[in-house]
């Protein structure tokens, strides 16, 4: 192109003449040179046109640049997946993950003794037999906020009402051993209680959880934890009453402490723990009551029940043990409860009272314990983290051609709600509390097709001695009311998904 332009300029310079100049004859040799130049310019122009045409054809035939791999685009645009999408901005310190839990139960609770009509002796026969219910319908979210803060919010919509599960705000700097928790959560009651209901070995937690009234409470706790090796926890908390209590007279409170130690000895992961709770009753309802269902909540009937006891509150001490040995696990806990009761004749102020609680001549004490063993036929191990049972990892998920995880569990669960607090001729207040004794023999089979899907079957036989229903179930016996024996069988199924 440059050469062509130069020749054109040279030609123009050579042949051009002022417009007003008179034409002069051109020598023959000059005319010949000009003609030769013109031919050369024409040839160069043809060559340039050919080169441009070739360049355009090559550009048109070249393949388009390959787009970025779809996986890379998805990775930059999609959230992480942990049972549900998790949105996270690590640089800013934000994260958000929706969560939920659905549990559907169906089962049968047997009728001890002859079937009677309606409610007799406090036992509602209409509420025994077959039943089904939505045990939990939980929706919520969890995540992180800048500066080491975190949150967890869960609402339970089962039974046509809104209940509150964990609703907490936490604070823990990265790698810090100190964690603060404020909100509505379980007050450090036991290994069973602190383990999520998504992950328990049986449909319901151990009997003392129900009997001793372990519910979430509004409070605050400070924990010392091991962020590196998960070797220990030590937590203390101060709590008020339940968050779903709409009254303004919530003067009851609780102080709790729990410690755990989880060393690994060879191939065995151990859990050793202890807990203590000091509970004070609401001042205008100074009473306590202890009762438990027969190992399932497909019925609301209880065969062990102390009724209301006039008391300032109670104190509870517990010991915890657990071990994971590859596909085996064992667990055991024991708790002792002491009631701080009021004696007959006790008087109260204008705004105090026992609200129907019975007075006893001494301070009753109750106790409960369980022991269980479990085994995964498919090679998994029970999960453990932070002083509680955690989610197992399914080795061969159903969606990848495997059979999922299959686990068998067996448990003995003992509860004693009877106590003679003073010498007397009767098996009633103020000398004796006939709350009854319950011994459960339980089996459960759990199938996890994937990490977040669970199907569970359970059988339980409850053996009872005494209690408030013994006279109705075993009428006409020559045995004292507190020694009359009967049994109740129950079977239940659960379908569960969580995210």
List where the protein language model places each region.
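Gram-negative bacterial Sec-dependent N-terminal signal peptides
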Residues: 1-20
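Residue-level detection of beta-strand scaffold positions
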Residues: 34-35, 55-56, 94-96, 170-173, ...
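N-terminal periplasmic/intermembrane-space "pro-region" immediately following the signal or transit peptide
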Residues: 20-103, 109-117, 377, 381-396, ...
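Short solvent-exposed loop/turn micro-motifs enriched in small/polar/acidic residues
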Residues: 80, 162, 213-215, 312-314, ...
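Secondary-structure boundary/capping motif
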Residues: 34-35, 41-49, 154, 168, ...
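Outer membrane beta-barrel
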Residues: 83-282, 365-400, 405-422
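Outer-membrane beta-barrel pore domains
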Residues: 25, 125-126, 288-499
